[in-house]
Amino acid sequence: MERERHVPVLLQDAIRYLNVRRGGTYADATLGLAGHSSAIARLLGPGGTLIAFDRDPEAMELAKSRLDALRAELGSEMPKVILHSTEFSEAEDLIEPGSLDGLLADFGVSSLQFDEAHRGFSFQADGPLDMRMNPRVGLTAAQVVNQFGEKELADLIYEFGEERRSRRIARAIVRARPVSTTAQLARVVSAAAPAMKSERIHPATRTFQALRIYVNQELGQIEALLKVAPKLLRKGGRLVVISFHSLEDRIAKDALREGGQQGIYEVLTRKPLTAGEEETDRNPRARSAKLRAAEKK
């Protein structure tokens, strides 16, 4: 299964820019399936501390199992691990100011979320229109699709999906209601806005992205984390951010640039790092990944 062969995106670059030091304190804001966290833990040693966040209860349980297996493997070399089943925007309340040697945030949706049809993130397999990273909290994508007005839907799809044909898509969704599954929504969107020859993505990709971002308030979460990051890092501490679409990357780019201009950060990546051909062949999801890094002055 995907969860068993999960390989974190840009792993070696992330570890290199984090500059993981034995005995240090590092935070993984997006634990996911613990790929990055496991690599960090291997380098920390018994005097180190790893703090990790994830609001997805299912991912947290799987990550705990992976970290337990790593603890059995490393024995006395395993660092202290502190896990928080909550949104990473709450890091300010859970991490001591100036205590981190490094903070990693990988904003991509995990393979677990994409590959499990019942989570409703993907049109690749039919499932209920849910899309919540924490299935216990907030509106589902189905509620948004079926309850929002046409203009509200169009604006949402345009803003968070950067979809130029948002009005046409919103009109088709309203006419097709009720829309309850991922496959049904994908069919409605594809019929309203067929794929253009110049595009390599599925015609429903941007609409699904927009709904997911809205349902999980993803951009607000990212902004909150990047705003508090300088307070959590000690002098010389590293911030490493991996984004997967232009909206995320724009927020990261602006935060690091502003931090550099204000003398808070030394920006370590003039241009974002991207995955090489070998990695993208192994993991096609890495194609859109961009890594940016900075060091607190």
UniProtKB/Swiss-Prot annotation:
Keywords: Cytoplasm, Methyltransferase, rRNA processing, S-adenosyl-L-methionine, Transferase. It catalyses: cytidine(1402) in 16S rRNA + S-adenosyl-L-methionine = N(4)-methylcytidine(1402) in 16S rRNA + S-adenosyl-L-homocysteine + H(+). GO terms for biological process: rRNA base methylation. S-adenosyl-L-methionine binds at residues 34-36, 54, 88, 106, 113. The keyword Metal-binding does not apply. InterPro entries: RsmH, SAM-dep_MeTrfase_MraW_recog, SAM-dependent_MTases_sf. Disulfide bonds: none annotated. GO terms for cellular component: cytoplasm. GO terms for molecular function: rRNA (cytosine-N4-)-methyltransferase activity. Its EC number is 2.1.1.199. It holds the Pfam family Methyltransf_5. It is found in: Cytoplasm. Belongs to the methyltransferase superfamily. RsmH family. PANTHER family: 12S RRNA N4-METHYLCYTIDINE METHYLTRANSFERASE, S-ADENOSYL-METHYLTRANSFERASE MRAW. Specifically methylates the N4 position of cytidine in position 1402 (C1402) of 16S rRNA. This is Ribosomal RNA small subunit methyltransferase H. The lineage of its organism: Bacteria, Pseudomonadati, Acidobacteriota, Terriglobia, Terriglobales. The gene is rsmH.
